Amino acid sequence: NVLAGLKSAIVAYSGGVDSSYLMDVANQTLGSKSLAVMSFSPSVAEDDRNDAINLAKNKNWNYKIINTLEMDDENYVKNDINRCFFCKHELYGQLVELSNQLGFDWVLNGSNLDDKGDYRPGMNAAKLHKVRSPLIEAEFTKEDIRYYAKKRNLRSWDRPASPCLSSRLPY
């Protein structure tokens, strides 16, 4: 268990299967030293936000909601091929700041081994902010995560990918 060596962690939590599974394991491993942080912005569908909040409440996770301001970044708004970098840069910047304020040691995301094969500029933002990807470290694929999420009775185990609303617009 990659998380066993951590003292505390903030999980970038969207309510999708990857971050839900990661948060569930973090909660089991770190207890009150884990915090799910959800980002609210115009890029996130309201149904996705509500589902994420409901899951966090039902699982009794510590959670916090922040508002990200990627829409204020002209680099994001111009909608080029690196749009996701600027969104994740905003998110991870806020999460690192929050972790420093609250005394958490790490910021984690739910990236998995399958994500490494895709074009993911957001992974560069994670690297820049020293965000860890424990599911990659543990060599978990999406299929692995769905399997273990189902065993943990996470409602999101078979949820289809739900990328942000901005990703539905071509570059």
Language-model segment annotations:
Residues N1-K151:
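ATP-dependent adenylation/nucleotidyltransferase module used to activate substrates
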Residues E139-Y171:
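Mid-to-C-terminal catalytic subdomains of enzymes
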